[in-house]
């Protein structure tokens, strides 16, 4: 790990240098440790590994593929890339895909298809916030970033740091909790495992997270709302 930037998570405008430098690393395909309002996560910029969001390919070269690995029949980024290090650090399978942090409700139709109106209503009510919504993936979502049932999980985070990074990168962030698979998710910078901190390219320290719990996950894939994981957002508020 190269650099740690310390910011005040409660500030409306996170430290500009921290955002700019972290976004620069993400744009190059690097891996960042970032605070959200729920727990700390490890994240990459989606546009560094896909065509879902256009990028200047003269500045950011195409990412290397791994000919020995595939998800849903599609090539995945090579070992050592930011995306693959998510799975190496967490010690989890490539098929356990990563949710996207997005800029708002419009992202449902940008990165999904056949969106139920109930999902839009729920997103308008609960976003930005601690709710992840699983939807059918649009063609622009890379095959290797989709779950086996052709879905992608989206969340608009209330964290000013996350919001600023999404704007600076011009891209969603593929982000998952910064922990060994099966271990508790870190709700503070101090709780992040040392080996994970050492395995990222840049880190943002905002102290403790406001929610101190992972997001609640819901799906509309089987004819109605299903709660897949109970998290920081109570079922009574869904």
Stretch-by-stretch model annotation:
Residues 1-238:
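Active-site-adjacent structural elements in enzyme catalytic cores
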